[in-house]
């Protein structure tokens, strides 16, 4: 029996921080819903700590390509804040590390096995600059 995916999110608007507890089998649809929640809250640019030690990513190569395209598309119009993801398995570490490397030019994303290291790294990140980069110009 597979556990349903879930993200329990706490947003601190004063500190511009977001904490997400991910659990269950995490699919592309679950990630999409999480990003939609961040967008709706105006929190894309916030520092984000994702505790995914209890989660299992279920992302096919096609899902990863779609997620990369989605995040790159977001980056055209809004900043993503620095994101620390804490994982519980080597497979999850490898998957998320690959994602971090591919997106390094648009998102500051780092993967950890140790929660305290993730917290320290995120605390050292510069304060986020919320809001859009600039309106798109079409010629």
What residue ranges belong to the model's regions?
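Amphipathic, Lys/Arg-enriched alpha-helical "gate/interface" segment within cytosolic domains
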Residues: 1-139
